[in-house]
Regions:
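Catalytic glycan-binding domains that act on GlcNAc-containing polysaccharides
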Residues: 66, 71, 269, 273, ...
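Alpha-helical adaptor scaffolds
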Residues: 73-75, 90-91, 103-108, 281-294, ...
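Inward-facing hydrophobic residues that define packing positions of alpha-helical scaffold repeats
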Residues: 53-57, 86-90, 119-123, 149-156, ...
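Generic helix N-cap/helix-start motif at coil->alpha-helix transitions
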Residues: 29-37, 49, 61-68, 81, ...
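Structural motif corresponding to the intra-repeat A-B loop/turn of tetratricopeptide repeats
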Residues: 47, 76, 80, 109, ...
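Bacterial N-terminal signal peptides
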Residues: 12-23
Length: 684
């Protein structure tokens, strides 16, 4: 239709749209130029000494990340910064993360100087524990009397080790009697129970005389139980001494249950235990004898006094009975679970499975039907047992252009997305977290969807998975990113693309720069040694660990490694997943001990909690990704061949199960009309 025959309103809209479109290339070019100049200017301010960043930053004043240039200069030169310098910056960038960074850096400098008057003038509530304690010091310096419950207890009861900045505050509380010996002992014993020896030692240092000696003994017993408790037969039979032995033995059982058991045989009759002390030791021995599947594990668990039982001991009673194939004992152990535990789909599914083993299928069927309403590992397995479709009920996020525009223009999010575009992901995540703290729930949902649509998948995955209201947004929670690449590489490695996707999702949640404490890198969390070996054997380019942050290379190496892992276990994806997480040596030990178990029972008896949950998570994710790609999903039970049975990856022609939404039809998550979004910051 020619433009001149359009209605007047439509012609006006068309003209505006055309004008916007005509400016887009120039705007994109200008933003691209700004990004390059920002990189150069940011590199200059990060050097020692800083380069001529102002010349490089000319014309960047309206660029979202510009305040970071000034903030970096101020923070690096904070010892020479004047109050006027700081106030000028804070005034021009109010409420922003750069403003917060500069303020907190200046507060640390003022605390270092002991300038508590200035500190109080610049103070704003902070999440930083050092600064929280510095603020309490500033209040003390001003002559304020602190209230322990309101001011100090939130810091004191935090189980993490307290920073040195808190020492003067705690010393003052000890001096005025508000930090009592009882409070010190409570913190010390809580830390000892958690194995936090640093916090326990810090608490012990506040005591004196016999209390200090007793506290030091507890810290030593928890830190090095073998060496410390070797002398325990010569210790006096006193309450705090018994505490030291009990806490030490509980810790020792975690490390070496056999040696702890031998020591308990010597010390059990040596001291006059109270019930709490004795139960602590008995519980630890029973649980950790169970995690190693010791022959006496079941007897120890059954001998526990009711007051010595906890959720962990009750769960291990189920696993030990399950591993032994004692179905009646397993059912009795399931009956002994707490009311809250019995609501968990894991234990409801296992109850139904054990009932089938006892030929009580009529009792099992309604339990399977109930569990099958969940889109989870046990829910999918339950659906297979009663031959029902999977309960996958997808939702979509309703569009609201006005709210979306407001969210997209929110200045903190604008900086987050700009950092993401530049590939500066740690900085992007800091801005993202800062921005999300300001938004209400509906606005957060739209922000996460915006991140998804901009290819920042991990933000959507983390947010929607943590929010019960949005866990059915499967498109955002299970992105089909790099689809052509993942499918090609997985097929080339002889594995199911849905399984490869599930491993990526479980390992990194699509955080391309993920780097674990175990030194694993990237989407599929590859160790540098594994990556180097795979690259050499597959003739792929690899020079350094940071190369693994390249998602395409990571997938190429990871799928090949996963394929080789599967080959070691007859193609079995569930066993290969266990080895991918825990290593081949532990899986070998478990197979030697329990290879005759059904796959679902074997998974439940995996000793490592992380691996046990990881395998179930990967298998459930495989179903969801298969459904996302094909509209149907290979039965989960088909992905779980018995140990020793050969398994072949499914093809497009492999029969798959349908999905249903039994409770309701697919729904839409509607935006809240009351959604509030902080306004964009004024231009500078």
């Amino acid at each position: 239709m020619p433009i001149d025959v359009l209605p007047r309103g439509a012609r006006r809209l068309f003209a505006v749209a055309l004008a916007v479109l005509l400016t887009l290339p120039a705007a994109a070019q200008d933003r691209g130029s700004q990004r390059e100049r920002f990189r150069s200017a940011y590199a200059a301010v990060s050097r020692t000494p800083p380069g001529d960043w102002k010349k490089l930053a000319t014309g960047l004043e309206d660029y979202p990340l510009y305040p970071y240039l000034e903030a970096t200069v101020l923070r690096r030169g904070i010892t020479k910064a004047t109050r006027a310098d700081i106030e000028s910056f804070l005034t021009r960038w109010p409420g922003s993360l750069p403003e917060n960074d500069v303020r907190e850096t200046y507060l640390r400098e003022l605390a270092r100087r002991g300038d508590w008057t200035q500190f109080r003038a610049f103070w704003k509530s902070s999440r930083d524990r050092d600064l929280q304690c510095d603020n309490l010091r500033a209040r003390l310096a001003a002559g304020e009397k602190l209230d322990f419950a309101a001011d100090i207890d939130p810091i004191w009861t935090n189980p993490r080790t307290l920073p040195a900045a808190c020492d003067p505050v705690l010393a003052a509380a000890r001096g005025n009697g508000s930090l009592t010996d009882a409070r010190v002992w409570n913190r010390l014993l809580d830390a000892a129970a958690a194995g936090n020896t640093e916090s326990a030692a810090a608490a012990a240092s506040m005591l004196s005389g016999p209390d200090r000696e007793a506290a030091d003994r507890i810290v030593a017993a928890v830190s090095n139980p073998a060496a410390t408790l070797a002398k325990a037969e010569q210790w006096p039979d006193e309450p705090r001494v018994r505490d030291a032995v009990a806490y030490g033995l509980a810790r020792y059982a975690r490390r070496d249950s056999t040696s702890a058991e031998t020591l308990w045989a010597k010390l059990g009759s040596r001291f006059k235990w109270d019930d709490a002390q004795k139960n602590r030791v008995l519980n630890a021995l029973a649980v950790y004898r169970s995690t190693s599947y010791s022959p006496d594990a079941l007897a120890r668990l059954k001998a526990l006094p009711p007051e010595a039982e906890d959720d962990a001991s009750r769960e291990w009673h189920v696993r030990i009975a399950l591993a032994g194939g004692d179905w009646k004992e397993t059912l009795a152990a399931l009956d002994d679970l707490s009311a809250l535990q019995q609501k968990d789909s894991r234990w409801r599914y296992l109850r139904a499975r054990v009932l089938t083993k006892l030929d009580r299928k009529n009792e099992a069927a309604p339990i399977f039907a109930d569990v099958a309403h969940e889109a989870s590992f046990h829910g999918f397995l339950a659906a297979d047992w009663i031959d029902e479709p999977y309960a996958i009920c997808p939702r979509t996020l309703a569009a609201d252009p006005a709210v979306e525009k407001a969210v997209a223009s929110q200045s903190d999010l604008a900086r987050a997305f700009e950092f993401q575009t530049l590939g500066m992901l740690p900085e992007a995540r800091r801005e993202w977290d800062f921005a999300m703290r300001k938004l209400d729930d509906p606005a957060k949902r739209l922000a996460a969807d915006l991140a998804y649509r901009r290819g920042w998948y991990d933000r959507a995955v983390f947010f929607y998975s943590a929010d019960p209201e949005t866990q059915r947004l499967y498109e955002q929670r299970f992105p089909l990113a790099l689809e052509t690449h993942v499918k090609r590489e997985a097929s080339g490695a002889g594995i199911d693309p849905a399984w490869a996707y599930a491993i990526i999702r479980a390992e990194s949640a699509w955080m391309t720069d993920a780097h674990s404490h175990a030194d694993a890198y990237g989407l599929m969390q590859l160790l540098p040694g594994v990556a180097k070996h795979m690259a050499q054997s597959e003739k792929l380019p690899y020079n350094r660990p940071s190369d693994l942050f390249d998602p395409t290379l990571n997938v190429e190496l990871g799928t090949r490694y996963l394929g080789r892992m599967a080959d070691r276990y007859d193609g079995s994806p569930w066993l290969a997943s266990a080895a991918y997480n825990a290593g081949e040596a532990p899986v070998g030990r478990w197979l030697d001990a329990r290879a005759t178990l059904d796959p679902d029972f074997f998974i439940e008896t995996i000793p490592y909690k992380e691996t046990r949950e990881y395998v179930g998570r990967v298998l459930a994710f495989s179903v969801i990704y298969d459904w996302r790609m094909n509209g149907k999903a290979l039965a989960l039970s088909a992905r779980m061949p018995r140990i020793g049975q050969a398994y072949a990856a499914p093809s497009d022609a492999t029969p798959r199960k349908g999905v249903v939404c039994p409770a309701e039809t697919a729904a839409t998550v509607a935006p809240d009309p009351s959604t509030t979004v902080p306004p964009a910051a004024p231009a500078h």
